[in-house]
Amino acid sequence: MAQYILLLHQQPGTYASVPRDQMMEIIRRYSAWSDGLRQKGKMVGGEKLTASGGRHIRVKDGKPVASDGPYAEAKDVIGGYFVIEAKDDTEAEAIARDCPHLSSPTNWVELRPFDQMAVAQAKAAG
């Protein structure tokens, strides 16, 4: 089985004005979807990310420098992620297509495979 990450992209503030009862229903859909994948042995993990408070770490003059991200100007942000296991790209894409994140028309999911060779080499190196 290969591992993939689903990066959940959305516009800033997508859920800011959603009434509490609707937000609870959205959370319920995400939980049901991820629980279903977990029962099938396809879910490795995932988390919602905070809307603010992140930092960018970049190299400047050869040294890592931290700064607040330009989130206000961002056209989209990563609102969360899931790590899944799938037998191949086709199965991973089918899982991603079913993600409840896609219920909002401005949201999108980025599906990326993990470099399995690098993972295997790291495990072998101990």
Residues of each region from the PLM?
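Conserved, structured core segments of small domains
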Residues: 1-126
